[in-house]
Amino acid sequence: MKPLSPKTLEKMYAGLGISADTADLLHRYWLCFSNLYGVISVRDAWNVFRNYEGTGLLHKKDFLAFSGIVQREPGHPYAVIELKEAYAGETTEDPADRLIVNGRLIGSGYGKFALLYATVEKQAGKPYWLPERKEDLLANTEDRFFLSREGKEMVHFLSSLRTDGRYRNYEGKPEGTLLDLDGRPVAGKRLPEFALYTRSEQVDIEYFKSEAKKEGLRREYAKTALEKVLDRIFTDLQTGGVLPDRSPGMSMQILLDLLCGDLGVSLTKAQAERLIGLYAELNNRSRLWLNRGWRPDEMGRGRRPGLPERLSAGPGLKKLMEQDPGARAEFERRLADLGIVLEED
């Protein structure tokens, strides 16, 4: 919906009749809903709020009315959308059916809500994680995904990787020189030290005729190589990917293709094993949207919800395994931590 002016929003808040402190508390909760759950209905959000605040602080009708105000308020890292806006065929106008959606689940164009749909599907049947202390929930007013020990270790490891300055085809063969946003070679630089457009991003930019659209995409894609890799890991782990049957092996293959193919990083056996281990640990110890805030290691040591029992290695992983037979054993061990068996070819 179209954002409202500050003056109009001020009048709406005044009409709601709640104190500034209560409005501030609600904004904090909304940030936590977005960061912790990814997507949650206003109805369920009310139940979470009531679990910690009771019913004395705010009436449900005022909670619902607040959702309509913040829906038109610009500058938030989340959106409040009507159910019928996200799902064709829905006609409900009940404000309780609105969805609080983290902005990273909303794309553009035809697949605008693809990640939203995928996340909602994987959330089905799972309870929301509700910590005993309200303070532990409200600690999520900022995105904490890479602030954990496991997240920091992943960032540290990726930050140490260097590019050889060549992009590769799907067979891993060099095809050209990688250039940064200013057209300079990036060979020898670490991932945080250069920004570039990947080949798929370049295709996206060239697809549009509108210069305004092109410029918007250039700004959106103008991230360092490290940021692009972290974004990929974040999206894959939080949502499980767009495909309902996407496996950890497939996600790892896509990550390796990004590192090797688009960013010119050649991993040694030791580095590949380290990456696989960090990926598994980050997955197991993170509060994931697809689990409604639960960590996989809190949901039992059996097979993780939404993950397959078996998978086959893709071309990139097969190549790593062929270089050293021990790599396969290590990869199998890491997958076993997720309750997954690597199938024989």
Where are these regions (language model features)?
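N-terminal leader/presequence-like segments
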Residues: 1-14, 329-345
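Short acidic, hydrophobic short linear motifs in intrinsically disordered regions
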Residues: 39-50, 59-61
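Charged low-complexity interaction tracts in eukaryotic proteins
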Residues: 2-15, 19-21, 64-133
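Alpha-solenoid helical-repeat scaffolds
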Residues: 16-20, 39, 57-60, 220, ...
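Charge-enriched amphipathic alpha-helical scaffolds
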Residues: 52-97, 254-257, 261-288
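Positively charged, polyanion-binding regions of nucleic-acid-associated proteins
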Residues: 15-41
